[in-house]
Amino acid sequence: MSARILDGKALAQELRAEAAAQIAELRTQIDRPPTIAVVQVGDDPAATRYVRSIDRLCQSLGAACRAIALPAETAQADLEATVATLSADDRIDGILLQLPLPAGLTLDGVLSRLAPEKDLDGIHPINAGLLAQGRPTLTPNTPAGGIELMRRYGIDIRGRRAAVVGRSAIVGRPMALLLLQADATVTICHSRTPDLGAVLRECDIIAAAAGRPGLITADMVKPGATVIDFGTNVLADGSMVGDVDFAAVAEVAGAITPVPGGTGPVTNIMLMRNLITATRTRLGI
């Protein structure tokens, strides 16, 4: 069996057009572009590249991006003050924190100063709680992109058995909740799960978010299953691979996302969708 490739790049182009139209409508309603503030602490090259990519995406869709670059030695109080100022700024519609924060800084303190209605990552305790209650408003972008990929490619989630490999607060847990809300029967697997393969072989949908290259092999996958790979692991030679042994699993699965080019492109569009939602909700549009 050769799996159908769930092409995130192609889907992202379709979603870009939808987002651009919605942003154009918002611009006429608020007489300015919807604006995202991206807060980066330190000068990690990968983080800097990502901020630039968000800036380019905003410009291409008609939104605005304000990048706030803070030195790595920024004190906790100063970071919290920056986030509080952005939260109070009426011309900032959404805030994105570049994670993880450098050593010595704690996320909980920063989130306490972040306006939940501007939380574009969906990680504020209020937004996480709403998601857990089945009333999501701003949903974490990466898992939202995985669900959108399945929905747009016509993959039925209702009534299916699903496994999420990984339990992070940004990807694994919210992905499990989104699958549950789509009426899947969900199992969360992690580093303490005995015999991971035995669990996965029973599942129609596998979402991999463990951060371990090649963790999921072909013998772990039920024939015809849908495999969503959130992994972004950079190898010593600079290449990027997912958590799934793509070539081998693609011969068994019914559908699979590649890395790169699968969930990643859709994740960024989900960020823009959250910006649109945040702007509309905050301004009562």
Curated annotation (Swiss-Prot):
Biological processes per GO annotation: L-histidine biosynthetic process; methionine biosynthetic process; purine nucleotide biosynthetic process; tetrahydrofolate interconversion
A Pfam family reported for this protein in Swiss-Prot or TrEMBL: THF_DHG_CYH
InterPro entries for the chain: Aminoacid_DH-like_N_sf, NAD(P)-bd_dom_sf, THF_DH/CycHdrlase, THF_DH/CycHdrlase_cat_dom, THF_DH/CycHdrlase_NAD-bd_dom
This protein's pathway: One-carbon metabolism; tetrahydrofolate interconversion
Keywords for this protein: Amino-acid biosynthesis, Histidine biosynthesis, Hydrolase, Methionine biosynthesis, Multifunctional enzyme, NADP, One-carbon metabolism, Oxidoreductase, Purine biosynthesis
EC number annotated for this UniProt entry: 1.5.1.5, 3.5.4.9
MF GO annotations: methenyltetrahydrofolate cyclohydrolase activity; methylenetetrahydrofolate dehydrogenase (NADP+) activity
Task performed by this protein: Catalyzes the oxidation of 5,10-methylenetetrahydrofolate to 5,10-methenyltetrahydrofolate and then the hydrolysis of 5,10-methenyltetrahydrofolate to 10-formyltetrahydrofolate.
HAMAP family: THF_DHG_CYH
Family per similarity comment: Belongs to the tetrahydrofolate dehydrogenase/cyclohydrolase family.
Name of the protein in question: Bifunctional protein FolD
Species of the source: Chloroflexus aurantiacus (strain ATCC 29366 / DSM 635 / J-10-fl)
